[in-house]
């Protein structure tokens, strides 16, 4: 079993005020404020959290959960900033994951506007979720030369 690295400390840009409510090795709770937005956020290594058995998680994958109701435009801005903050704090993170309730078209659309891509619907013990991810270019980049074997 691969050891799960600690969750990185996130530094948000763009005027967000951040208050740490709780921080542990693999998860943390933040209170974020910007203008009229006041939102609770939970960040967690997927391999140590509720999604650990939901898909083939990477040790460095991070789930971001917005725990308070936020308007769609504000949710988009918040998710975009959280994804960027995770990628700045942990350049080896392969996936930033946002789990929307399955069938919630508004949350899925807000996440997609923030740069997330819908990848799979999963069933947890108590709910069904649509997983959306942001992945860095080094994960999604492909070599279109099919005759070339990488690193040869």
Model-derived features with residue positions:
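Conserved GNAT acetyl-CoA-binding A-motif
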Residues: 86-100
């Amino acid at each position: 079993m691969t050891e799960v690295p600690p969750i990185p400390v996130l530094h948000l840009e763009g005027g967000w005020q951040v208050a740490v409510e709780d921080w542990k090795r693999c998860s943390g709770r933040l209170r974020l404020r910007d203008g009229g937005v006041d939102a609770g956020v939970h960040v967690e290594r997927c391999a140590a959290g509720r999604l650990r058995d939901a898909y083939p998680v990477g040790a460095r994958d991070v789930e971001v959960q917005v725990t308070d109701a936020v308007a769609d435009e504000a949710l988009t801005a918040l998710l975009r900033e959280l994804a960027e903050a995770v990628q700045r704090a942990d350049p080896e993170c392969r996936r930033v994951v946002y789990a929307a309730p399955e069938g919630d078209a508004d949350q899925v659309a807000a996440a997609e506007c923030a740069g997330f891509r819908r990848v799979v619907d999963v069933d947890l013990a108590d709910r069904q979720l649509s997983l959306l991810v942001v992945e860095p270019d080094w994960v999604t980049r492909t070599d279109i030369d099919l005759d070339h074997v990488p690193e040869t």
